Regions:
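C-terminal structural segment of proteins
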Residues: 1-269
Length: 269
């Protein structure tokens, strides 16, 4: 691991200032991906800006009455374990609690964060499918970014240099479910599918199958006509452009998308 300067700010303003003052700095959230990358030399930042002491970035709350449509607000530094155990998440979006509870193992869930997962945008991560599948918005220190505009490519997002995720706002769906076919050793998604019906319409978001999370438009169109498991029958997902590796071929992943979407919808009816 290379030498670096460590900063521990207590506010978002101080965090962005510290990062801007460094030559090649990184924000440190839970460290579940960044620290292993630093240990192997894949990432060599000159400065690490720890976010753990910024209270503004932690916590879960609901929109105040009269603030428009009800929504769930989750701070970027909220851990997976906290999301999974939160009473409001379990009551309002139980599928999101289930998603968080299935990430990694207990050690990963105790340290890993919502904002860290989204900022990295690992192609097999769970949260991108949940955020995209619920039509959430990502709030940063500069602006609000719709989920549809956030995920750009392999480990690539709409975030600009130095931009910091502060919270994610989830609209409350009428129905939602999450299904994951996991790689047993890592518990990452070989394919994961999040379905929802609500203020953002019908959405089917997929992770693990492509270079980044995406919406399965053919399945959405079928479910718009009728929200039932049978609507997924006969919807073929093209394997072209999907991931293929030692765990699964592109054709198998394409098949899993439809199978998991059908199972997810079945959970909601």
């Amino acid at each position: 691991m290379n030498n670096f300067d460590f900063h521990s700010p207590a506010s978002v303003a101080d965090a962005t200032k510290a990062l801007g003052a460094g030559d090649d700095g990184c924000y440190l959230a839970g460290g579940q991906s960044l620290l292993p990358a630093m240990k192997t030399g894949l990432s060599m930042p000159t400065d690490l800006v720890g976010l753990d002491k910024i209270a503004q970035l932690k916590g879960i709350c609901t929109s105040a009455p009269g603030a428009g449509r009800p929504a769930l607000h989750i701070g970027a530094m909220t851990t997976h374990a906290a999301v999974a155990a939160n009473a409001d998440v379990i009551r309002l979006i139980p599928a999101l609690a289930r998603l968080a509870d299935g990430i990694g193992d207990s050690a990963v869930r105790a340290r890993g964060t919502l904002g860290g997962s989204l900022g990295l945008n690992d192609p097999a991560a769970c949260y991108p499918a949940g955020v995209l599948g619920l039509g959430a918005s990502i709030t940063t220190d500069r602006r609000s970014i719709a989920a549809d505009d956030f995920f750009k490519g392999l480990y690539e997002t709409a975030l600009e240099p130095g931009e910091l995720i502060t919270e994610v706002i989830f609209p409350i769906p009428e129905k939602a479910a999450w299904m994951k076919f996991k790689q047993p050793a890592s518990r990452f998604s070989m394919v994961g599918v999040f379905v929802s019906k609500g203020p953002a319409g019908v959405r089917v978001a997929v992770t693990g199958a492509g270079h980044f999370a995406f919406r399965a438009r053919a399945l959405e169109a079928a479910l718009e006509k009728q929200w039932s498991p049978a609507s997924c029958d006969g919807v073929a997902i093209a394997p072209a452009g999907l991931n293929a590796d030692i765990h699964a071929s592109a054709a198998y992943r394409a098949h899993l998308i439809t199978v998991l979407a059908k199972r997810a919808v079945a959970q909601t009816v």
